[in-house]
Amino acid sequence: MRLAFIEACLLTVIVLGDRSGELRGQDQSQYVIQSDPARIARIKSARPQPITGPVPYNTPAADAIMAGVELFPADNPWNTLIEDWPVHPNSRRMIESIGATKPLRYNQDMAFVIVPPDQRKVEVKISAYPDESDRGPFPVADNVPIEGWPASFRRDPALRALTLQDVQRGKPSLDADRHGIVLDPANRRLYEFYRLTRTDVGWTAEQSSVFDLASNKLRPDGWTSSDAAGLPILPAIVRHDELKRGVIDHALRFTVRRSRRAYVYPATHFASRLTDENLPRMGERFRLRKDFDTSSFSREVQSILVALKRYGMFVADNGLDWAMSVSADDRVPVLHDELRRVKGSDFEVVTAPAGYVPPR
């Protein structure tokens, strides 16, 4: 449900619904969801950009388009301010299970293509998870990038000679996540694929997900997405245009090596056999502590750290501990040395306030 926005002061959105998640038994008085009005103002003031063909994400044209794209409504979990949310009672133990002394890091992994509203749709053969996939056809462009393209390949001497078509067809290995992401801003649709691969007879993938960017609707309970938690990926990555602007106004995603056999809103799926309550669930939300001093970091890293204080980051998949997702855009500077100064102990796990009702 799209709601009216109040832009004169901090945007407040009152939502009603029946998805109470872990709030059962708590005080159910109404909680007012908060979102940043500057985000809405930025989107509304952006000059509309014509999209006449597929636009690679790592271009100035894509930067201009993304400035005016609203990835889900203002009251969506990705766009909700959580600075005042309470700390989870088991926060310390969950932090320790991941590694309190381990550094924050990132994978320069995710890539996407922006397509026009009339992009030709093609079939994608879904193999591993057809019962938890959305049906096609899909507007997959010929130049859709596969996870890691281009930066992860161009910065590796052993992979530098590979072309996009090589990567689309499975080089250097099919044994990888190979996420493929397609954004259709005009129709407000997001298409995400797990292990997307081009073959002589068309495209294949192990899973396909379609998200309505005008809606807060989740995937069906128990369903995966191209991410293990059942969440979308594109709203969660750090992009070049955001680093250049100096503001990231959404939550981020990260991975942990060991997660629990459970999920919490807004996740819909788990990917573990472990039941230890000290392990984080898929969808667990972490926030950088308010007292963490960001003043000595570069402008780009400050924008990431401020976002982690204001919006936090969700456990979205299994992988390297404390690893966020940054776009595989070779315009993004190397940030590893700075981010490694942030440790697991600088975070806290948060939980939704009493009376919070997930938006529909």
Language-model regions, residue ranges each:
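Bacterial N-terminal signal peptides
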Residues: 7-18
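Positively charged n-region of N-terminal signal peptides that target proteins for export
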Residues: 1-4
